[in-house]
């Protein structure tokens, strides 16, 4: 019954948004309330769950999205993004620029949460599209696929690292297996899949991209342009290394845990960009603040829609759907690796959150390791693969992709949802292949 209610809720949401063109935030909050009541929650519980979902989603994302938009706008409006884009196109050529973005996404994704890398790299994608004339999704999807793959398979990214800690898997082994799986997965879900998306003629959302083409004299140098963009990556990467190698009370680790926090790292990059890209190129502080102010207005509705997705997700979590699915799977006779993937996939589809799906799955299947002696590293990767399948309207990431790529709900289902499902299936096949070779 709980799964039928969820399916009905998703159908209602699609009808409201596609059929009646209801605003995304309003539709998500309304459907969250309807599903909550249908699942047996009382009015106060539904209200608290919606408020908690919005608060917890924005609590982690508001500063990241805000600072990311500010930094992206500064990089875009000062000509830095155009400089980086033209350099990449000149180095790799238009035909290979996708591969440049795949590599960039993998490197950036290792140190960052998906959302941080997404908002940081999108201005670069927009500028490459403007400079090359290539379709937006053809250029952007390979980068997004690379970011998503690191979220599933590659420590020291926080996602697989957290699952590996629960399973007590060796991080080096997990990284090795994950890298083997990553290569074919990102090729299929990125450059190959994006070739099917050239029919989607989309432009970047207004306010998130400056279409002005800068002259050679107006643009900063390549190294000056890239410096502000990579500062967050460097700080977060150092923080990740310190977390693995240094004791918790070590002063150096504590310092880099602070400056390597995603929001703090982005803020530091903004301060640096104000001087290296703004003031250094002759702009006044007032002009720079106007650029920063415009960036916030451009993402306001995107932020609210993501918050609505968080509310829907939290109602599903609080209604006990996760416990229902966990109980449903406890008595199955699936192999440990298939069980990890299946439980994570069901939880992902039902709850929306990849993180919640992965962590819950780890708790459900952890006893299996002791009984079956399954490879913990492969269990981590199977869980990560299952946790990203079929992202749809109850996932805040769905709305993030929709908003920044200027898509309708239907178009997002045919692009983002399919891409995430390809990553999940390729990941499972990779896990099973490695397991067959090793055992």
Curated annotation (Swiss-Prot):
Upregulation: The gene is located in the idnDOTR operon, which is involved in L-idonate metabolism. Up-regulated by 5-keto-D-gluconate.
Family according to the record: Belongs to the GntP permease family.
Membrane topology, as annotated: Multi-pass membrane protein
GO biological process annotation, one example: carbohydrate transport
Name under which the protein is recorded: Gnt-II system L-idonate transporter
Taxonomic path: Bacteria, Pseudomonadati, Pseudomonadota, Gammaproteobacteria, Enterobacterales
Any one GO cellular component localisation term in the record: plasma membrane
TM annotation in the entry: 12-34, 54-76, 97-114, 119-141, 171-193, 219-241, 254-276, 291-310, 323-345, 349-371, 378-400, 415-437
Catalytic activity reported: L-idonate(in) + H(+)(in) = L-idonate(out) + H(+)(out); D-gluconate(in) + H(+)(in) = D-gluconate(out) + H(+)(out); 5-dehydro-D-gluconate(in) + H(+)(in) = 5-dehydro-D-gluconate(out) + H(+)(out)
Molecular-function GO terms, alphabetical: gluconate transmembrane transporter activity; L-idonate transmembrane transporter activity
Function of the protein: Transporter which is probably involved in L-idonate metabolism. Transports L-idonate from the periplasm across the inner membrane. Can also transport D-gluconate and 5-keto-D-gluconate. It has been reported that gluconate uptake probably occurs via a proton-symport mechanism in E.coli.
